[in-house]
Amino acid sequence: MNKVQPIRDLEKLEELKEELKKKGTRDYMLFYTGLNSGMRVSDVVNLNVNDVKNTNGTMKSYITIVEKKTKKVKRFPLCNGLLVEMEKYTKNMNNGEYLFKSRKGTNKPITTVQAYRIIKKASEKIGLKDIGTHTMRKSFGYHHYQQFKDVALLQAILNHSSPSITMDYIGVNQDNIDISYRNFNI
């Protein structure tokens, strides 16, 4: 079994987003939210309208959650793109509704297993491999690192214990190893 990888190619990321849109706005927004927040899928699926909107219906500029894995409080701003998309997505939703509702039952979130199936199926349709629920978070990390080149900042965002764990997690160490092998010759 191969290790889940970030999606490094921006064109493939766009292609995957388009594929998810074909399935429905919920599936697209699930991926888009994970991709642009760096949250673990277990936290993404449990978001509800109250997490992103104030009681008067205006959008919050920050999300505050208690991470399911670490039990730590995490507060972070919504990037502009996510803010715009989330405002459109939640326009007709009520406070207390889960953002990514299961189609089974009343106001239940989709499971992490269902999130995996959604992402995996769309990824396979466009020819991506080594995809899993961590793909969103790893892709966030990879592209954040490519934009800002600040491993300490990314380590803090992802709540990792060391820079090397962060670099391994986002696949940058493996990229560097691969490049060194390709360019090595005695």
Regions found by a protein language model. Give the residues of each.
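Conserved catalytic core of the tyrosine transesterase superfamily
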Residues: 1-186
